[in-house]
Amino acid sequence: MDEEINTRYVENKPYSFGGKYRIYKAYAKKDVDKALQKSDIYSRFKQHRRAKSFSPIYVYRKRELFQSDTVFFTTPELVEANHGYKYLFTTIDVFTKMAWVYPMKDNKCKTVMTCFQDILRTCGDKPERLNSDRGSELVCKQFATFLKDNKIHHYLSYSLRKCPVIERFNLTFQRLLYKMMKQHNSYEWTQFVDRAMNIYLNRRHRTIKMSPLEAEKDENEPIVRRHSLRNIEKLR
């Protein structure tokens, strides 16, 4: 049983590489607890939750607000193993939790803008607003002009907490990548991006009570809105 659970834990399932509670529905709790105690991948990257308070973000529809950020993988061994790729551009729809990720060799304004243009082509809609921190790649004149031409209002976060939704996604996605790197004893994180993204998009999100792919469906928009606002009320 232990071997079966640990094997299932690292497959391409929505609950793969997640917390124990995600796999409780598939196996008895006591069996999961016992099996994952022996898993080096689970134990090493186990998340230690701490109480945090964030200002609530009110969104009422899909494509109302995007948040973007850049994740750094700049240690020498990671750069060498990934053929020069050092950054990951990430963007999330705050309402549906749909996300897009792009590995980059540099974080110059032109590179980031190309990634963002591809996101707009992929999702088929433009966001009304974009929120980010003050990273130079996101506040350059060229990117600002592009957003203005597309009537996307860009505003910056100056607080220490920055943009909590994309920051939370970044932590989740990095943890998935590092667990896969540990599983395969490899520094080549770029080869696991698609696999990690597939797991994230099909995984049930605690706030909206469904996966991002399900939340993207038009018929689910009222349900997502109800769950999101109910969750905000709990935090107040």
Residue positions per predicted region:
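Domain-scale segment recognizer with a strong primary affinity
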Residues: E3-Y9, Y21, D33, K46, ...
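Short beta->alpha junction loops
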Residues: P103-K108, S159
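Short, well-ordered alpha-helical microsegments
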Residues: M113, V139-K141
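RNase H-like DDE catalytic core and adjacent DNA/metal-binding regions
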Residues: M1-T96, K105, R121-E128, C140, ...
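Well-ordered alpha-helical segments embedded in enzymatic catalytic cores
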Residues: Y87, T111-D118, R168
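Short small-residue beta-strand/loop micro-motif enriched in glycine and branched aliphatics
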Residues: K97-Y102, Y155-S157
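Short catalytic-loop micro-motif centered on adjacent basic/acidic residues
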Residues: Y102, R129-D133
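Conserved beta-strand elements of beta-rich interaction domains across eukaryotes
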Residues: F73, F95-K97, G135-E137, S159-K162
